[in-house]
Amino acid sequence: MEALKTVERFRVIRTIDVAVTCYPERTYKAALTAAQRTVRRLVKKDLLRRYRTDRFQTVYGLTKKGADWLDEHGVEATSSVRRVSDMTNPEHRLWLQFLVLCAEARGLKALTESELLRELNRGVTDVSRVRQGYLKVRVQRPQGAIERDLRPDFVAFEADGVTWGEVDRSKRGAEREASLAALVGAIGRTAADGQVVRRMVVFCKTERIEQRALAVLRHLALELAHHVLIEGRFHLRETEPGIFEVWTALLSPLPGGRSQLVDTRIGHVGVQRLPIWLPKVRVDSSNRHSTAGWFNENYLPYRKDGGWG
């Protein structure tokens, strides 16, 4: 049932989504083998239908029979095959929902961008009050600074705050690079739902995209290091390749009603590769792709300071 509920939720899935949802405790090859068996069985029963996208990705949609089966088992559902058949390149949505499922496999609540917007606007009837952004930031541009409402590709909620996730399938232009720098400056601030943004992770499809994102952050770190750390300013410190700590100065009370500024780490920023090799893995001896990055490592849904335990 979990596999069918997942395709009802996202409307389109890959086999790797079933591996994450149903078999995250297994090794990757074992999880993939079990997921392939599950998907084949559901396709044979006409509960799922298989499609190939223009980019030669195999995806699955929920059939009318599959939706009826879920309805009979207490899950409201509708067929998605017509919508899936019209999709040409759903790669971005496939990756962000994969990362959401990975976060949930770690025991976190997680939402895609569209799910987050629905939650932010639940019960809102006045169109003028509909929220389109999750966090307001000040973006520096050559023409001057402007305020922008930004929203993540996905979010994951941890005990200390929220993780803001970005999926970069292409190199950022100047506008998006400026937005990336602005988001770093927003670490530690409160988002529209009252959650504090503690982490931002940028997932990059290629090494070139990854290196450019790292260059933006390293340049920002050098610029910020020239300024003394005081309240309202922040420093960005790379502690290991692709992982940065965000520091600021916060007032700490002293005896006698006095206070002092104390350097305080308020969050993290990470840059890492999308695990595009995982869907390419074959379970037989012909496999030439790595299985690195599965749940036995500190990689999914994102690299975490101190690991996942």
What are these regions (language model features)?
Residues M1-D86, W308-G309:
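Nuclease-adjacent, charged terminal/linker segments that flank catalytic cores
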Residues K29-V39, Q143-L150, V197:
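Glycine-rich, flexible loop segments associated with nucleotide phosphate handling
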Residues A174-A178, G185-G309:
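Non-catalytic C-terminal interaction segments of nucleic acid-processing enzymes
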Residues A34, E91-W95, E175-S179:
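Soluble or luminal CAZymes and related metallo-dependent hydrolases
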Residues H73-L116:
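Amphipathic alpha-helical dimerization/coiled-coil segments
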Residues E104, K109-W164, R169-R176:
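Active-site metal-binding core of divalent-cation-utilizing nuclease and nuclease-like domains
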Residues C22, V39-V43, L99-G107, V184-A191, ...:
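Hydrophobic, Leu/Ile/Phe/Ala-enriched alpha-helical segments that form helix-helix packing faces
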